[in-house]
From Swiss-Prot:
This is TOMM20-like protein 1. It is a single-pass membrane protein. It comes from the Eukaryota. Pfam families: MAS20. GO terms for cellular component: mitochondrial outer membrane translocase complex. SUPFAM superfamilies: Mitochondrial import receptor subunit Tom20. It comes from Mus musculus (Mouse).
Length: 152
């Protein structure tokens, strides 16, 4: 029996020694890798490359797909507004033009364009309608915020 115990003890000692050697070799390689200037440079490059990806949603309000959809909506609303005004449906025309104004990235430039292209009385009526549409939009936003806050 002593030879079996000796064999098991020797085997356990060799396994423990092998584990220590393997672990120390891994620590040594990691130490060498971290001291390598090329590794540090690659690590910094990865961090820099990963950083804008994390901050991109904060800088960009909409993703490109939604932005394209908004542009299509904008052009459709302008066209519908023009058609309604040509047909004499001023109420619907103003509504479409104000919707286009609300989603436009540069509303001042669009207002200047409307001022040049629309008759003065139509442009003035459009200006009068804008605060009402903005107020309706704010009320809609407030009501949706209350719905989001409700736990039900």
């Amino acid at each position: 029996m002593p030879s079996v115990r000796l064999g098991v003890g020797l085997l356990a000692g060799l396994a423990a020694g092998g584990a220590v050697v393997l672990l120390s070799y891994c620590v040594y390689l990691d130490w060498r890798r971290h001291r390598d200037p090329a590794f540090r440079r690659r690590l910094q490059d990865k961090r820099r490359a990963g950083q804008p990806k994390a901050q991109a949603p904060a800088r960009q309000l909409w993703d490109p797909v939604k932005k394209e959809e908004l542009q299509e909506y904008f052009f459709r609303e302008v066209q519908m507004g023009k058609l309604c005004l040509i047909r004499g449906e001023r109420g619907m025309g103003f509504e479409h033009l104000t919707n286009a104004l609300l989603v436009c990235e540069q509303p001042k430039e669009l207002l200047m364009f409307f001022k040049k292209t629309l008759p003065p009385e139509v442009f003035q009526m459009l200006l009068d309608k804008i605060p009402l549409i903005c107020q309706q939009l704010e009320e809609t936003c407030r009501s949706t915020e209350h719905l989001k806050d409700d736990p039900d």
